[in-house]
From Swiss-Prot:
GO terms for cellular component: ribonucleoprotein complex; ribosome. PROSITE patterns: RIBOSOMAL_S8. Belongs to the universal ribosomal protein uS8 family. InterPro entries: Ribosomal_uS8 (IPR000630), Ribosomal_uS8_CS (IPR047863), Ribosomal_uS8_sf (IPR035987). The gene is rpsH. It comes from Lactobacillus helveticus (strain DPC 4571). Keywords: Ribonucleoprotein, Ribosomal protein, RNA-binding, rRNA-binding. This is Small ribosomal subunit protein uS8.
Length: 132
């Protein structure tokens, strides 16, 4: 079966593993998924990730993060720009997620970055997802 939205699949696998309190989740690799994983790690939403070669496209193993009492660090993940309805914004119109408590992941000419970094660089782009 052909997957029409691999980024939505990536976010859904993380969301489902997080809800089931799994320690880690394996996801088929791609460059944009690696970039999103790096952002999630840098912003403190996941513990770590590693890319393994499986003689095909590779696999990203994402290690989920939980609080000291087992509470989830990721409260929500939402896909914004979809293949059927792309969502592009200018630098002035970049969204704030939960008044700055969450992040928007934006694909720009400067790479895949957070909404905060995009504001600092004054670049707009495609809003991929919200994470809070």
């Amino acid at each position: 079966m052909v997957m029409t939205d691999p980024i939505a699949d990536y976010l859904t696998r993380i969301r489902n593993a997080n809800m089931a309190k799994h320690d880690s989740v394996e996801i088929p690799a791609s460059n944009i998924k690696k970039s999103i994983s790096e952002i999630l790690k840098r912003e403190g939403f996941i513990r770590d990730y590693e890319v393994a070669d499986d003689n095909k496209q590779g696999v990203i193993k994402v290690f989920l993060k939980y609080g000291p009492n087992g509470e989830r660090v990721i409260s929500g993940l939402k896909r914004i720009s979809k293949p059927g309805l792309r969502n592009y914004v200018s630098a002035e119109d970049l969204p704030k997620v939960l008044n700055g408590l969450g992040i928007a992941i934006v694909s720009t000419s400067a790479g895949v970055i957070t909404d905060k970094e995009a504001r600092q660089k004054n670049v707009g782009g495609e809003v991929i997802a919200y994470v809070w």
